[in-house]
Amino acid sequence: MSYREYRDRVLNFIEDHEHWRAHTINLIASENVTSPSVTRAVASGFMHKYAEGWPRQRYYQGCKYVDEVELIGVELFTKLFGSDFADLRPISGTNANQAAFFGLTQPGDKAIVLHTSHGGHISHMPFGAAGMRGLEVHTWPFDNEAFNIDVDKAEKLIRELEPKIVVFGGSLFPFPHPVKELAPVAKEVGAYVMYDAAHVLGLIAGKQFQDPLREGADIITASTHKTFPGPQGGVILYKKFGETEEIAKLQWAIFPGVLSNHHLHHMAGKVITAAEMLEYGEKYAAQVVKNAKALAEALAEEGFKVIGEDKGYTESHQVIVDVSDLHPAAGGWAAPLLEEAGIILNKNLLPWDPLEKVNEPSGLRIGVQEMTRVGMFEDDMKEIAHFIRRVLIDKEDPKKVRRDVYGFRAEFQKVYYSFDHGLPLRE
């Protein structure tokens, strides 16, 4: 095979992927789709440029245009989230978490985070960014019934450990975390309050979730490609806290600490996404939550065990389903089978699962943000729930269901809540 043929194969795989994705029901809770305008920015000549440091204070020449874009981004992000500062340089959510841990803590400091089985992100763990910083990692007490942090036990743990940092947020995140209740306790013992908003950043921007900075968080870290429908990347947002020296340490941890150049084409895409969210974000986020609730209710009606019934199932983009009663391999069986039908989601540990069950966990994690962005409403969630039932409960041939999924999804080919296509219209 010639090298040109390798090139052709790669381009063909990309084309195949794009067609496949446009005709699947993508319910991965950590993904989204960008608008044509954002896609244009990411594919721009900004990808060829290198920049280090702050706008207008670069270590490289030739940055006058990228500087202007980044300054617009700082303006838009601070307006969108009501923060005093916005740093668009992190290149992922984990990279933002690294910067926060390195800027605000020292090796040997104590941290309280959410356990992986309870929805905590791997970067918060001893084997992730927190551990790489040398933190002594402890986990929040968790109430399995409430599917949330146990506030009373958490208060006691904070006072007992006197941690340097406490971390809210995670990857399994159907309900707001008790920031307002626990932030004052953390600050009593001198701890920083960090909120990892990777999954819910778009809902916060759209005023449909808790407002961490107003509830007591010192700093928000996040990725920019989940409910916030931008390109893959990260961001750090914070109010003024502590001494100027502390903020300087945080900024120093970002550059030169955990990154140098910050992928300027993705930065430009983040900026346009922030503008889209200022224009359309409240309507988008509200519909995301409506769709999540509608899907949860529809799945329950179809016979699935949906977590959180007594709390309205969800207040975010996520729906959590326990499929352990359907097959011994549970999520490890269900997710691949649904993929055959063109329904893409992921298996997930539930709070009562031991870590050893990571490959065959009890749960499925479902996110509706991307299907919302392509114009789906509550009635469409009922269709999706029925597709899932046909595969997992009725044991229908996934390939047969795939044909119906393909036809259903073909009707949703525009990206709404954007300057390119505006708002979707209900049928």
Swiss-Prot record:
InterPro entries: PyrdxlP-dep_Trfase (IPR015424), PyrdxlP-dep_Trfase_major (IPR015421), PyrdxlP-dep_Trfase_small (IPR015422), Ser_HO-MeTrfase (IPR001085), Ser_HO-MeTrfase-like (IPR049943), Ser_HO-MeTrfase_PLP_BS (IPR019798), SHMT-like_dom (IPR039429). Its cofactor is pyridoxal 5'-phosphate. The modification N6-(pyridoxal phosphate)lysine is found at residue 226. SUPFAM superfamilies: PLP-dependent transferases. It is found in: Cytoplasm. Catalyzes the reversible interconversion of serine and glycine with a modified folate serving as the one-carbon carrier. Also exhibits a pteridine-independent aldolase activity toward beta-hydroxyamino acids, producing glycine and aldehydes, via a retro-aldol mechanism. This is Serine hydroxymethyltransferase. The gene is glyA.
